[in-house]
From Swiss-Prot:
The family this protein is said to belong to: Belongs to the protein kinase superfamily. Ser/Thr protein kinase family.
Gene3D superfamilies, A to Z: Transferase(Phosphotransferase) domain 1
Protein name: Probable inactive serine/threonine-protein kinase DDB_G0280559
A GO term for molecular function: protein serine/threonine kinase activity
Organism: Dictyostelium discoideum
Matching SUPFAM superfamilies: Protein kinase-like (PK-like)
Length: 213
């Protein structure tokens, strides 16, 4: 049983017991949209443990990554993901001491400490809270890790170097530029632009060609 606090519900919620049919019956539109997004992220962590698979195998084939994320996306209403959501209290994070997989965490306790998955703008203090831009960045980091078996910025100095450099997007190692990886690399690149306004939106992600093949 996973208990997390959410400002959406103003009380502890057992996200693992939130079923899609229950979500569809929620009358408050904003709460319903947030619930779907929370369940989407929770499914990534609790059902698939993607990064545990990466840690065991080193990296994952593009087709397997596609299949994994298709399964997650197919369980939820595409039109609801990313609409009007404001999830200031949650994020995908990684405990550096206990868990190898991404988890939904309380924003105020974990976000700024989680340098592995935090978006560049949060180091500059230009954005407060978790928004669509930072969530897209985090998803891009997870996809990058699935493809390469490594984090793009495994240490804090490397993140700082990227933030202060003239580079506008994260570079993927050349050995992964293969025809079967082309759409995945395109998606990762669109998620990991330094400028948040240039990043792909959630609606564009779920409709991306990578998930359509």
């Amino acid at each position: 049983m996973v208990l997390r606090y959410s400002y959406v519900f103003k009380q502890p919620v057992n996200y693992s017991n939130i079923e899609l049919n229950e979500i569809k019956n929620i009358k408050d539109e904003k709460v319903r949209q947030n619930s779907i997004f929370i369940s989407y992220l929770n499914g990534l962590y609790n059902s698939l443990n993607v990064l545990e698979m990466v840690s065991i195998s080193g990296s994952l084939p593009s087709k397997l990554i596609q299949s994994i994320f298709k399964i997650i996306l197919s369980n939820y209403d595409y039109n609801a993901i990313g609409k009007h959501f404001k999830t200031e209290s949650i994020l995908i994070g990684e405990s550096l001491f206990k868990w190898p997989s991404p988890r939904i965490q309380q924003f105020d306790q974990f976000f700024f400490q989680d340098y592995l998955y935090s978006s560049p703008e949060n180091y500059k203090g230009s954005l407060v809270g978790v928004n669509e831009y930072s969530m897209v960045w985090t998803l891009g980091i997870i996809l990058y890790q699935c493809l390469t078996g490594e984090l793009p910025f495994p240490t804090y100095p490397k993140i700082v170097n990227f933030i202060t450099s003239s580079s506008q997007n994260v570079e993927i190692p050349p050995q992964f530029y293969k025809p079967e990886n082309s759409l995945l690399i395109q998606l990762i690149t669109c998620c990991l632009f330094k400028n948040p306004a240039q990043r792909i939106s959630w609606n564009e992600i779920v409709n991306h060609s990578f998930f359509k093949n």
